[in-house]
């Protein structure tokens, strides 16, 4: 097992990465024997993993209850959060309880947001089971739910007490979910690390075959990059916003199509293509780098074209509701080369529309 740390003073926490680590002693730190906890998962994962996780929690002496939610992005809502809060109250969980998120990004977001507001804040532990949540969503403290008018519009920053990344969970992950997670992996490489991008160009096929050694390295690399950013800019006041590369366009696709119609990583893949094309059109990104980004996304099996039934103009209202908008001005994360990105504002909307049209 390898351990990284997100350094945030008294709120620092470990990220544990390895194979079959869910059964290791003290893996559920900061929980101690006799502590109360609530496991939150969905119906699919409950059938696959709940008994195993329950066994190890009870073996550790934890008093554990459960909430089993519906499965899918369309259920990342305030209504599902109310299910969690009601269960906590009915089971008489106090302020020293710990919520445990067993699942992907949806479960992690719902659990984290619930933890942030239940009795004004309780601890929670992330046990991410998808590649997307292992490399991105479980680390950093962003929690929230969707609104009809936009993705993740209601939420809070609430850091977990620990993150437990067991790569064995990926062996039961549907292949399209694995591919979806690769979008966030590629994101890190494009905006932060040219060497990692080259490594992905060489190893993406074997990663998709779930080579343990390669996957452990890949997850660790992504978590290291994100942990460094979180330590410097926890509340996204500055360059943490770079992590939203592709998300302004991608969230528009998700909202327009209906949450759950496109997997998050699929929408972000197309969003990264659109952002890269925008950067090329304004003279920042070289055509060769644009083609390399496009090629790697294709190699990973990710979509590079937006939905045919969504016009370029229909992206703009969603993009203007993006959380990076300041004083009515759209701000976009654009790559300027492989391994570097910047935040741009004031880009001509006709250029943005052209980039979208070129990616349809």
Curated annotation (Swiss-Prot):
Catalyzes the conversion of 3-deoxy-D-arabino-heptulosonate 7-phosphate (DAHP) to dehydroquinate (DHQ). The gene is aroB. GO terms for cellular component: cytoplasm. It is found in: Cytoplasm. Its EC number is 4.2.3.4. NAD(+) binds at residues 71-76, 105-109, 129-130, 142, 151, 169-172. Its cofactor is NAD(+); Co(2+); Zn(2+). GO terms for biological process: amino acid biosynthetic process; aromatic amino acid family biosynthetic process; chorismate biosynthetic process. This is 3-dehydroquinate synthase.
